[in-house]
Amino acid sequence: MRINPTNSGFGVSTIGEKNLGRIAQLIGPVLDVVFPLGKMPNNYNALVVKGRDTVDQQINVTCEVQQLLGNNRVRALAMSATDGLTRGMEVIDTGAALSVPVGGATLGRIFNVLGEPVDNLGPVDTRTTSPIHRSAPAFIQLDTKLSIFETGIKVVDLLAPYRRGGKIGLFGGAGVGKTVLIMELINNIAKAHGGVSVFGGVGERTREGNDLYMEMKESGVINEKNIAESKVALVYGQMNEPPGARMRVGLTALTMAEYFRDVNEQDVLLFIDNIFRFVQAGSEVSALLGRMPSAVGYQPTLSTEMGSLQERITSTKEGSITSIQAVYVPADDLTDPAPATTFAHLDATTVLSRGLAAKGIYPAVDPLDSTSTMLQPRIVGEEHYETAQRVKQTLQRYKELQDIIAILGLDELSEEDRLTVARARKIERFLSQPFFVAEVFTGSPGKYVGLTETIRGFQLILSGELDGLPEQAFYLVGNIDEATAKAMNLEKESNLKK
């Protein structure tokens, strides 16, 4: 991994002699800059415009070279608002790509696309920085062994297991528990894998970014008293940012994650919320640069841009980056080029269901809609695969019977179907579990359930050994032993009432 030891502040690396150009044209966030003969900057070089506007306010805008136009002219894209810029202003070529701070100094802090802290907690150590543009790891560096990334969340580990170094799509509307699930995963990777997380907020609402930060502080994922003990670094490029910032903020977050993987040799979780906004920003940039649009108005380079981001997210012999990406599906059209291109890269999907959330079953992961390419006997083993398939079959049969139950009632079902329904309801409740990060809201301590414990629990329910226990005993518990203990307590309570 290439690291630049610099003391130059954020966004850029210093070079000895300044290469100066001047703004020739300015259209929104796009600048045309003229440089002296033979001093043209390279593609993706960072340019800095410094000066004062008409009301004597300080201007400091960083841009990225996108096109070399000829006649000593380059076209660059601004990473922040271009208010106050005028033709003829001086532009400095930094001689290098955008570079951002990396390492332990980033934990517990919020950054913008340039790696500048935006949380009013003072400066960040910038002695170790890294450029945001890198090629994906060489094939020889990759760890090709297929292994499961245990999350400690029963429904995920059993029915839609995550691949170590894989990409997972997270689908769900507002208010079904996406944020809590994300925070629990951040908490669990830190405790069980000694890993860290990087959260990339790409083109979403500023309010949501602020809410996430506040919730992370409340749940202890970000340690206010000792920032260095925090488990996550946050990088935000929100809806109000120019398209250049929204297009590059994903790369900034990924660069920070790569350092933890390659240098610290850790397992890293990289969250991208929302991957659709990355594509959307690329589409805006493409139009601004005058490229011919492709299908549905998207950029012609859609697959290339997506690939250059996704191929860097992988397992190497040093460590792994496992990525969880929230996917917005425009107009619920799964054939739209943006989600369709994203699906090609995903190893698993976690679908959150409003119906389950309404029943109070959290995490509200839909066990039938969520999928994973890892759920194969040769990868997870026969026992895990068989248990998962039987759980799905039981839940599917229950789903088919629900219309009959609603119209005719349970009594009209056959004995076998009644047993299936009873077991399915136990399974449904056993798929819920108390989260560590939700302790402050629920009052019940969080539970991390290992994969072997999860499989054992569901096998006992399916075998019929626990048919005599009430279904509420399975609700919001950790392993199956807690469910049996809860059933005994419920029985004692009911006997006392009598």
Curated annotation (Swiss-Prot):
Keywords: ATP synthesis, ATP-binding, CF(1), Chloroplast, Hydrogen ion transport, Ion transport, Membrane, Nucleotide-binding, Plastid, Thylakoid, Translocase, Transport. PROSITE patterns: ATPASE_ALPHA_BETA (PS00152). It is found in: Plastid, Chloroplast thylakoid membrane. Its EC number is 7.1.2.2. It is a peripheral membrane protein. GO terms for molecular function: ATP binding; ATP hydrolysis activity; proton-transporting ATP synthase activity, rotational mechanism. One of its GO terms (cellular component) is chloroplast thylakoid membrane. GO terms for biological process: proton motive force-driven mitochondrial ATP synthesis. It catalyses: ATP + H2O + 4 H(+)(in) = ADP + phosphate + 5 H(+)(out). ATP binds at G172, G173, A174, G175, V176, G177, K178, T179. The keyword NADP does not apply. InterPro entries: AAA+_ATPase, ATP-synt_VA_C, ATP_synth_F1_bsu, ATPase_a/bsu_AS, ATPase_alpha/beta_chains, ATPase_F1/V1/A1_a/bsu_N, ATPase_F1/V1/A1_a/bsu_N_sf, ATPase_F1/V1/A1_a/bsu_nucl-bd. Gene3D superfamilies: 2.40.10.170, Bovine Mitochondrial F1-atpase, Atp Synthase Beta Chain, Chain D, domain 3 (1.10.1140.10), P-loop containing nucleotide triphosphate hydrolases (3.40.50.300). PANTHER family: ATP SYNTHASE (PTHR15184), ATP SYNTHASE SUBUNIT BETA, MITOCHONDRIAL (PTHR15184:SF71). NCBIfam families: atpD. F-type ATPases have 2 components, CF(1) - the catalytic core - and CF(0) - the membrane proton channel. CF(1) has five subunits: alpha(3), beta(3), gamma(1), delta(1), epsilon(1). CF(0) has four main subunits: a(1), b(1), b'(1) and c(9-12). Belongs to the ATPase alpha/beta chains family. Produces ATP from ADP in the presence of a proton gradient across the membrane. The catalytic sites are hosted primarily by the beta subunits. This is ATP synthase subunit beta, chloroplastic. The lineage of its organism: Eukaryota, Viridiplantae, Streptophyta, Embryophyta, Tracheophyta. The gene is atpB.
